[in-house]
């Protein structure tokens, strides 16, 4: 299960709206355990300049910097997020091929009218599997 505070969901949605019609992407920082809890997000650069409408590739330096930030805050990178402009919040074949095991992937459907659903996924041996995503109050999402 992945817990995402509502205020951080709004940050992700804002990023998706600002980047529309391109895919935006970023890192999810938080606490790992039986329940993964996202406590911070970090925007990343989409390196797929020619195909940002339907592809994303996170700049490796953003991952290095995000990992450093996470460790400084006693957190880990629990996953990544990206938007799907004018498409459902489900992994594409491209997404599934490039997903790393262990990490959670939050996908945000977005359109010219605004944001749609947000879903979470993990790569398992059998392919991408939807992960339970629970939206929590900002207070509950704080790192204690």
Locations of regions flagged by a protein language model:
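Conserved beta-strand-loop surface patch within small alpha/beta domains used
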Residues: 1-77, 85-144
